[in-house]
Design a protein with these regions (language model features):
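Non-catalytic terminal/accessory segments
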Residues: 1-163
Length: 163
């Protein structure tokens, strides 16, 4: 707080809070409150305390914020329904551009599960959209999988290793 005052800056009290975060936050939180340490949201990510895969050392982990995840899924679903009449090849090509953009922003360390879940939901929405186009040309799930082999969707990938 003193540092902010030095530069004539103020925090909005209703939007700010102090939380215990760091190496000993998990142990202290379990001892004091009997639960996991608090998390915070920033720039579409939820930051939480975790441990590294190879060692038991403290590690800051990020995952896609639940609210942003739902908003992005809803926007993608609406986009698919708006563009359901374009040819499949073009639809998948444009959808891949959107998917890669999502992966590039949210593809950070420890977030592969969330971007994988995003792809899973997008695949289901695409299946529904393609089956709404015409009852004569609707896909079975096996036919849809074959179509995805011909026009594959972009796979999730970690683009930035933060920690």
């Amino acid at each position: 707080m003193e540092r902010l005052k030095k530069f004539n800056l103020e925090l909005e009290e209703s939007k700010s809070r102090m939380i215990e975060f760091g190496r000993y936050a998990e142990a202290n939180s379990k001892r004091k409150y009997g639960k996991k340490p608090e998390t915070f949201d920033f720039l579409g990510f939820t930051f939480y305390c975790g441990k590294g895969k190879k060692s038991d050392n403290f590690c800051v982990k990020l995952k896609t914020n639940r609210k942003k995840f739902q908003q992005k899924l809803k926007a993608t679903k609406e986009w698919l329904y708006e563009h359901q009449t374009i040819p499949v090849k073009e639809l998948v090509m444009k959808l891949n551009i959107k998917l890669v953009g999502h992966y590039r922003y949210y593809g950070v360390s420890h977030n592969i599960a969330k971007i994988g879940a995003f792809l899973h939901f997008v695949q289901r929405y695409l299946f529904k959209v393609l089956n709404r186009r015409c009852h004569k040309q609707s896909y079975t799930w096996d036919g849809y999988i074959e179509m995805l082999k011909e026009y594959p969707l972009a796979k999730p990938k970690i683009y930035v290793k933060l920690f």
